[in-house]
A protein has these predicted regions:
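Conserved catalytic core of the tyrosine transesterase superfamily
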Residues: 1-276
């Protein structure tokens, strides 16, 4: 895409989109360009519609992936190129949604214990024990770890809502060990470039590698640890409104799905619990 890519990214920055959203939209624009082997500004509404159908019918992509591609295309063509009304569509979101897969606490411990080094262990412990999104944990700064208050500040997370979440005692000790060994600078977790935060893809690879070593199966990427955090809190009796604040959800219904996970897990285990 070249110059168009830069223009689109600048357009998104000016609209206040998060780095994670920008990366997603740019990825889908790149895939669209590769699919047609043409510059995206030469494509018609029919071309875009055919590509979206390709994702739905041939690739069988998840709805969230298709919706992200659709949103990115709409912003590119209607927003950046000012084509007016876009005439490509996707189906409405399916009403039936799968409950998030959640590991038992023991499996989370196995995954964390299977990490290859202290930095990887600290990364996964922080992700799980604070319920962070992957782009939130990779963009933590050392000063966000508020040890006196036993809190972690999540700065400008999804939806640009700052919040505080838990800092577990074991996580704090691991982070202190990590600090003494690695001496991080501006960013708490970095990759090969010490001046930039760890790439999201690197964090995902760390999780997948640890999960494979541990022998734990099921689940998807590192985001599963965030689902585990919320469900384990509700299992422990924390009310859903508190979970909502720590997770940074804008809607209580988003947090309430973890209550359903808890009820399901208890029913299949032969236990009963009333969650008000």
């Amino acid at each position: 895409m070249g110059e168009l890519r830069e223009r689109f990214d600048n357009h998104m920055i000016l609209r206040g989109l998060s780095p994670n959203t920008r990366r997603g939209y740019l990825y889908h624009m790149t895939q669209l360009t590769k699919f047609y082997m043409r510059s995206p500004d030469t494509l018609s509404n029919d071309d875009i519609q055919k590509y979206l159908l390709h994702l739905i019918v041939r690739k069988k992509q998840a709805y969230d992936t298709i919706n992200q591609a659709f949103s990115g295309f709409r912003l590119f063509y209607a927003g950046l190129l000012r084509r007016g009304k876009t005439e490509f569509h996707i189906p409405p979101r399916p009403k039936m949604k799968k409950l998030p897969l959640v590991y038992p606490v023991e499996d989370v411990v196995r995954i964390i214990d299977a990490t290859g080094n202290l930095k990887h262990r600290a990364l996964l412990m922080t992700t799980y024990s604070a319920g962070l999104r992957v782009d939130e944990v990779t963009r933590l700064r050392p000063e966000y770890i508020e040890s006196k208050r036993m809190l972690i500040r999540v700065d400008q997370g999804k939806g640009k809502k700052d919040r505080y979440t838990l800092l577990a005692a074991k996580t704090l000790q691991t982070l202190r060990d990590y600090w003494r060994s690695y001496k991080p600078g501006e960013w708490l977790f970095v990759g090969k470039n010490p001046e930039k935060p760890m790439p999201i893809g690197t964090a995902q690879k760390i999780f997948y590698k640890a999960k494979k070593r541990s022998g734990v199966t099921g689940g998807r990427g590192i985001h599963t640890l965030r689902h585990c955090f919320a469900t384990h809190l509700i299992d422990a009796g924390v009310d859903v409104c508190t979970v909502k604040r720590m997770m940074g959800h804008s809607s209580l219904s988003t947090s309430a799905k973890y209550v359903h996970v808890t009820k399901y897990r208890l029913s299949v285990s032969g236990y009963q619990l009333t969650v008000s």
